[in-house]
C-alpha cells in the first residue's frame, strides 16, 4: 500500500506537513494522479480509509464508517529555484469533516538569499458533536548560504483551533504556539596557518503559546576548527522547557 503514496510524494510536500500518509491507515480503494506540463505541476488523491470504523462497539456511531478523503496540490515554477503553489484537502467522516487550504511560495531573491512563505487555514466540524472551529497557521523563513556567512531565520505562528487530520505537526508547528528559531554560522579561511578553516555559530529558539507564555527556549553557541585531515569542535546548549 505504501508505494501508492511514495511515488512523486514531493508533489504534495509543503513546509508545513499537511499530508502524512500514514494517517490513512487502512485504505479500501483510491485513485491517484500526478503530472507536469512545462512549469506547472498537479497532483490529486481520492481515497477512503476503513480504519476509523473498525473495532468499534456496535452502538458506536462510527462503527463501520469510512473516512472519505480528497487531496489536491498544484504549483508553478517561476524560475529555476522559485515556486508558488496551493494545497487543498478534505477528510469527511460521519457528520464531520476537516478541510485544509494552503498557499505557499519559495522565492530565490539572489544567488545567496531564499525565502519560503506559507499560510494555512483549517475548518473542522467534529465527527460526533461539538462546535465547528477554524484556525490558521502562518510561517515565513529566510535563508542565506555562502562561503563566509550562512543564516537561517524561521517564524511560525499557529492558532489554538488549527487542526490537520491528515498532517503531522512537530513541536514548532503545533496549535497554540508562536515562535522563531535562528541560526548563524560564520566561516573563516586563514591564509597563513595550518588551519584550513574555522567556524563560529549560534543557534537560538523561542517558543511561546499564543498568549505569550514561554514554552521552550534554547541557546547554543558552537565553534569548529578544521585541519587538513582532522576537525575539532566544541558546543554548548542551554535550554528550558515548561511541560
Q: Where do the model's predicted regions map?
A:
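Exposed, low-structure sequence patches enriched in small/polar residues
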Residues: 118-243
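Carboxylate/His-rich catalytic cores and anion/metal-binding grooves
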Residues: 1, 30-71, 232
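Residues that cap or anchor secondary-structure elements
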Residues: 1-35, 44
